[in-house]
UniProtKB/Swiss-Prot annotation:
The name this protein goes by in its record: Superoxide dismutase [Cu-Zn]
Pfam families in the record: Sod_Cu
Lipidation (S-palmitoyl cysteine): 7
CDD domains named among the record's database cross-references: Cu-Zn_Superoxide_Dismutase
Length: 154
């Protein structure tokens, strides 16, 4: 039976969206589908953060979900945080259609993202290749525009 989750993204500004997650079997890839609106045109960092705490907005979500204590990277890199999902790309209308698959995150087990926070960032994630210390932690993706806790879905 497939595992499903959903995340409603909201921020202090116009950025908002909904992301659906589906994993057909434990240990299998997770498919993410949805949309984010209100963005500036271009790429925006897209990560799962460690905590599901949004009591003070997106700032209390903690760092990227990184249970293996690795450096920041891109979604196809061996060296990456579990929560590193790269970028979403907004069109000239500020909408990013999300349709991706990731084999590192999970909806169950030790790498489960259930109860953690999904965040979309102000800037492009440099995938850990920016040449400075911040790049190896955050990808220089900038401020947190919108976030939401990932919850179990029917």
């Amino acid at each position: 039976m497939a595992l499903k989750a959903v995340c409603v993204l909201k921020g202090d500004g116009p950025v908002h969206g909904v992301i659906h997650f589906e994993q057909q079997q434990e240990g299998g890839p997770v498919v993410l589908k949805g949309f984010i609106e209100g963005l500036t045109k271009g790429d925006h960092g897209f990560h799962v953060h460690e905590f599901g705490d949004n009591t003070q907005g997106c700032t209390t979500a903690g760092a990227h979900f990184n249970p293996l204590s690795k450096k920041h990277g891109g979604p196809k890199d061996e060296e990456r945080h579990v929560g590193d999902l790269g970028n979403v790309t907004a069109d000239e209308n500020g909408k990013a259609d999300v349709d991706m698959k990731d084999s590192v995150i999970s909806l169950s087990g030790k790498h489960s993202i259930i109860g953690r926070t999904m965040v979309v960032h102000e800037k492009q994630d440099d995938l850990g290749k920016g040449g400075n210390e911040e790049s190896t932690k955050t990808g220089n993706a900038g401020s947190r525009l919108a976030c939401g806790v990932i919850g179990i879905a029917p």
